[in-house]
From Swiss-Prot:
Name this protein carries in UniProt: Protein D345L
Coiled-coil residue windows: none
InterPro entries: NF-kappa-B_Signaling_Reg (IPR051703), PDDEXK-like_dom_sf (IPR011604), Restrct_endonuc-II-like (IPR011335), YqaJ_viral_recombinase (IPR019080)
GO cellular component, as recorded: host cell cytoplasm
Pfam family, one: YqaJ
PANTHER family recorded: EXONUCLEASE, PHAGE-TYPE/RECB, C-TERMINAL DOMAIN-CONTAINING PROTEIN, EXONUCLEASE, PHAGE-TYPE_RECB, C-TERMINAL DOMAIN-CONTAINING PROTEIN-RELATED
Keyword Ligase: no
Localisation: Host cytoplasm
Known function: Plays a role in the negative regulation of host NF-kappa-B signaling pathway. Mechanistically, recruits IKKA/CHUK and IKBKB to suppress their kinase activity towards NFKBIA.
Presence of keyword Calcium: no
Family label: Belongs to the asfivirus D345L family.
Predominant place of localization: host cell
Originating species: African swine fever virus (isolate Tick/South Africa/Pretoriuskop Pr4/1996)
Source lineage: Viruses, Varidnaviria, Bamfordvirae, Nucleocytoviricota, Pokkesviricetes
Length: 345
């Protein structure tokens, strides 16, 4: 696993300008559900228009900031709960090296997990499993992390995330299993941190269970800031949403993370404010590699790239785009979509 990750140490770092530029010319793992007709929120043709720069992405900036903030926390918790280390969380895997030019994947990382065998099945070993296993083995896995802002968490992988995971597995030959990590975080004031269910109930519904862990996210200005830090964990829902949208402008702020179970605010310069977090659900769902996934779906990726090239090369991109939308049928039939969803779930 380490040798494989090192192959991409010089690739564009995730969320860098170079990474954004490359992704604009490729079909990334997160684009796949849309072009395969599995994304209920975005279609093949909307994705095509975005890649062709015909209009800007309609981003939910608050939800994007939330996911980015808590991706790092989720990695820390995964390392703690599974006694592992996540690597390769900043690489970009270009599919050209495997014969899939124009396709790429930017995984949330790779790590080793211990599987324990009991009652005729294998399960992922965590610090919460007080089990004497008949046998154990350690395997490398691909990591995909989601931290929904307000979507309810279910004990399964949403079908529109499966293509992203299968893409990462297909472009990672040494890895045969992925894990889908989904966590439910809640915001709280600093005074609410600790072994209790208290959270900011203006932002989230009340919780009745105790948290698995908690910590502090500190927000610092990149400019000199001398005002007293604010406890953002006590804001009302709308003001906190506005804060998340402000944090989307990453060049204005730096983010610092406490270790899990910290309750004291750190002392550092230019602190604008901080807020506490608690995690109440932390799911780790195994996903096995589907060997034929990328081979079967690559023709649709190629069709998308041809459409994209046609639009970009046209002297009238919008007119060409409209012709493509009007003249082509959906890349997948309804039956294909149903069959593909059944295959992955």
């Amino acid at each position: 696993m380490e040798t494989f990750v090192c192959l991409f140490k010089d690739s564009p770092q995730q969320r860098s300008d170079a990474w954004h530029a490359v992704r604009h010319t490729q079909v990334g793992g997160s684009d796949l559900a849309s072009i395969l007709g599995l994304n209920p929120y975005k279609s093949y043709y909307i994705t095509l228009a975005e890649k062709a720069n015909l209009f800007k992405k309609n981003l939910n900036r608050a939800a994007c900031s939330w996911g980015t903030l808590f991706e790092r926390v989720s990695k820390d918790l995964l390392e703690l709960f599974c006694q592992t280390t996540v690597i390769g969380d900043n690489i970009h895997i270009d599919g050209t090296y495997l014969g899939y030019p124009g396709h790429s994947n930017s995984p949330d990382g790779f790590c080793y997990l211990t599987l324990g065998y009991t009652q005729q099945s294998w399960e992922i070993k965590t610090i919460f499993n007080n089990v004497c296993y008949e046998a154990t083995k350690r395997i490398p896995v691909l990591v995909e992390i989601k931290s929904p802002y307000n979507r309810k968490i279910k004990n399964s992988v949403p079908s529109y995330y499966m293509p992203q995971i299968q893409s990462g597995l297909a472009l990672s030959p040494p890895i045969s299993m992925g894990i889908y990590v989904e966590a439910m975080f809640r915001v709280c004031g600093i005074h609410q941190l600790g072994w209790n269910s208290e959270t900011n109930i203006d932002i989230h519904p009340p919780e009745s269970m105790l948290p698995l862990a908690w910590g502090i996210i500190t927000i610092c200005s990149t400019q000199e800031h001398t005002e007293a830090p604010q406890d953002f964990g006590t804001l009302d829902a709308e003001t906190f949403r506005q804060l998340l949208e402000t944090l989307y402008q990453k060049d204005q702020y730096t983010i610092h993370y406490s270790m899990p179970y910290e309750t004291a605010c750190p002392e550092m310069p230019n602190v604008v404010g901080y807020f506490g977090w608690k995690v109440f659900i932390f799911q780790i769902i195994p996903v096995m590699k589907h060997p034929q996934f990328l081979k079967d779906k690559y023709p649709i990726i190629q069709q998308f790239l041809r459409d994209l090239h046609t639009i970009k090369a046209s002297p009238s991109p919008m007119e060409t785009y409209e012709k493509i939308c009007c003249s082509e049928e959906s890349p997948l039939s309804t039956e294909d979509i149903d069959n593909f969803t059944d295959m992955l779930t």
